[in-house]
From Swiss-Prot:
Name of the molecule in the record: Dual-specificity RNA methyltransferase RlmN
GO cellular component: cytoplasm
Cellular compartments annotated: Cytoplasm
Record key words, sorted: 4Fe-4S, Cytoplasm, Disulfide bond, Iron, Iron-sulfur, Metal-binding, Methyltransferase, rRNA processing, S-adenosyl-L-methionine, Transferase, tRNA processing
Active-site residues annotated for this sequence: 95 (proton acceptor), 350 (s-methylcysteine intermediate)
Source species: Burkholderia vietnamiensis (strain G4 / LMG 22486) (Burkholderia cepacia (strain R1808))
Length: 379
């Protein structure tokens, strides 16, 4: 039986786990063994960790847990996209999405319950900010998804070789602004990269930010993974409206931060994400302005057709307009992709499942009834 003050071992990266084992009087190699059991063999308890001394297993049973996020619902799209809704307590939920492709499998991971940045086109931002996720809640999304996907394919837990791994890429592009939860996100990403955990390369872990400039610099100094920047506008006036954080860190400051980051980045370009909004930011003139503002930053563009949601007041750009916009960028020699819409039959926009939970919670608070996450049957 664990004590009320037990620690969740998923909260520790390698350094933290060494320190914790040291506090139990154990040598550093025990931390490596423990980490492999947790993150490579999906161990849920300590009794099965047969290469750990029985005395250590007994210590751990009295002091520690391997506490996973609670799955509220699991949805599978006709195109293979899979979305989990994770209950993080107090009527809050976050989403984790797996996107299978022919040569890779990408997991989109959330870092916060809600988001304080409040981008105009983002469903999550409309919910407001509830709290930061813990390291355990962040890395737990990858652990949950990797082993659930392996089980669905009949693959056993074990060291994450290329033949066994299902999740080949992680993008910190789910709910929340990762750089506003830096102290929990970075240890989680260290585990993603650790060969004794998930063993992904820095090129295969991408953090997406709306432009928290000071933390971009810190990330570059401490853990430079691939970087994506949510740009969405080619000038400060429009970006102030679409991405309010721009008022604090305007485009000139943001572009300078991107240049600094590239000096240490695992890739030689920044990915700029650009949500295509009909009549707002999608003209050829906007595209030319975009080229001008990013001219000193080696980059590629990822154009994202807007996923409509209630109360946004926005419309997705027409396919032909997206094509014209993209062509301006391509003609200038900039690599440009248009994101495919995936999983429309299970959720039209990131944050909508969690938003429905939030709406039910608010209704419960008004009516005095108990809030509860209701499981949604997989499609």
């Amino acid at each position: 039986m664990t004590s009320e003050t037990s620690v969740n071992l998923l909260d520790f990266d390698a350094e933290g786990l060494v320190a914790y084992c040291g506090s139990l009087g154990e040598k550093p190699f025990r931390a490596k063994q423990l980490q492999r059991w947790i993150h490579q063999y999906n161990a849920g308890d300590f009794d099965g960790m047969t290469d750990l001394a029985k005395s250590l297993r007994e210590k751990l049973k009295g002091r520690a847990t391997i506490g996973m996020p609670e799955i509220a619902s699991d949805h599978v799209s006709a195109d293979g996209t899979r979305k989990w809704l994770i209950d993080v307590g107090n009527g809050n939920a976050v989403e984790t999405v797996f996107i299978p492709e022919e040569t890779r499998g990408t997991l989109c991971v959330s870092s916060q319950a809600g988001c304080a940045v409040n981008c105009r086109f983002c469903s999550t931002g409309k919910q407001g900010f509830s709290r930061n996720l813990s390291t355990a809640e962040i890395i737990g999304q990858l652990r949950m998804a990797e082993f659930a996907l392996r089980a669905s394919l009949g693959r056993a837990p074990g060291p994450n070789g290329k033949a066994e791994r299902v999740v080949t890429n992680v993008v910190m592009m789910g709910m929340g602004e990762p750089l506003l939860n830096y102290n929990a996100v970075v240890p989680a990403m260290r585990l993603m990269l650790d060969d004794n955990a998930y063993g992904l390369s820095r090129r295969r872990v991408t953090l997406s930010t709306s432009g928290v400039v000071p933390m971009m610099d810190r990330l570059g100094a401490e853990l430079p993974v691939a970087l994506a920047v949510s740009l969405h506008a080619p000038n400060d006036a429009l970006r102030d409206e679409l991405v309010p954080l721009n008022k604090k860190h305007p485009l000139r400051e943001l572009m300078a931060a991107c240049q600094r980051y590239l000096k240490v980045a695992p890739r030689d370009f920044i990915t700029f994400e650009y949500c295509m909004l009909d009549g707002v930011n999608d003209t050829e003139a906007h595209a030319r302005e975009l080229l001008a503002v990013t001219r000193d930053v080696p980059c590629k563009f990822n154009l994202i057709p807007f996923n409509p949601f209630p109360e946004s007041g926005l419309i997705r750009s027409k396919p032909e307009q997206i094509k014209r916009f993209a062509q301006v960028l391509i003609d200038a020699g900039v690599v440009t992709t248009v994101r495919k819409t995936r999983g429309d039959d299970i959720d039209a926009a990131c944050g909508q499942l969690a938003g429905a939970v939030k709406d039910r919670t608010r209704l419960a608070e008004r009516t005095g009834t108990a809030a509860k996450i209701i499981e949604v049957r997989a499609v």
